Amino acid sequence: MIVTLTLNPCTDRTVTVDSFHCGETNRAQKVQTDICGKGINVSAVLKNLEQETMCFGFCPKEDKEKLTGFLNHLSIPCEFVETEGGLRVNLKIFDASKGVLTEVNEKGTPVSKAAVSLLLEKAEKVFEKASVLVLSGSVPPGVPSDIYRRLTEKAAKKGIRVILDASGDLLKEGIKGKP
């Protein structure tokens, strides 16, 4: 099974305008809202390719039903550690005349040390089902930059292949785990 990790799930709200004018009122021609996060997106594609997959990570309790309901609708099993707050919102403004997308992404609700510890503990059980682990995306405030390295090391002890898609300090620390 391919287990995907999403530590900072979100709602993408994509607004299409004919021509975006900064500092002015712009009228939306189309609005689309999607539940996502890099790991969730990977699992959705894998499911479409008829691959066995599972989502693992954090789930803000205010939007737990929305997130788990979305995954259940796609028949993707999930194992989440509940955190405070709601899904972060990423605003995407698409200027149709220029074919340009402008993004404004929230950081996410801070996660407690206890939630991080619980995630690392639950990883032991979740990894029993995994042959591949995909670590991808941003992390909310409160999650240490070495989280991907720590999870990679746990996975390696079980012979799980790890794919890392990260940037900045998450990538620098993550590659120390030798994914």
Regions from the PLM with identified roles:
Residues E24, N48-A130:
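Conserved N-terminal subdomain of the carbohydrate kinase-like
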Residues S19-C22, L71-L74, R149-L151:
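Short, solvent-exposed amphipathic alpha-helical segments in soluble enzyme
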Residues L5-P9, F58-K61, T83, A96, ...:
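Cofactor-binding loop segments of dinucleotide-utilizing enzymes, especially the Rossmann-like FAD-
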Residues V132-P179:
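Conserved beta-alpha-beta core of the PfkB/ribokinase-like small-molecule kinase fold
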Residues M1-F56, K64-K66:
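Glycine-rich phosphate/adenosyl-contacting loop at the front of the ribokinase-like
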